[in-house]
């Protein structure tokens, strides 16, 4: 699902989801723990929960 999410970012934002968000905050990318840092990180957290 992570690769699909990256493809969605590529199509919507016009930038590489992996390179821009692969290591962003606590939840964007592989794994995740702690409290989301901001709205973007919260979006990744919500995606991880589905």
From Swiss-Prot:
Principal location listed in the UniProt entry: secreted
Listed PROSITE patterns: PA2_HIS (PS00118)
Tissue specificity remark: Expressed by the venom gland.
UniProt superkingdom: Eukaryota
Needed cofactors: Ca(2+)
Keyword Nuclease attached: no
InterPro entries: PLipase_A2 (IPR001211), PLipase_A2_dom (IPR016090), PLipase_A2_dom_sf (IPR036444), PLipase_A2_His_AS (IPR033113)
GO biological process terms held by the UniProt record: arachidonate secretion; lipid catabolic process; negative regulation of T cell proliferation; phospholipid metabolic process
Active-site residues, record numbering mapped to chain: 47
E.C. no: 3.1.1.4
Subunit structure: Monomer.
Protein name: Acidic phospholipase A2 1
């Amino acid at each position: 699902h992570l690769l699909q999410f990256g493809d969605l970012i590529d199509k919507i934002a016009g930038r590489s989801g992996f390179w821009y968000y692969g290591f962003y905050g606590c939840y964007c990318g592989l794994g995740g723990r702690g409290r989301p840092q901001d709205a973007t990180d919260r979006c990744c957290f919500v995606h991880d929960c589905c």
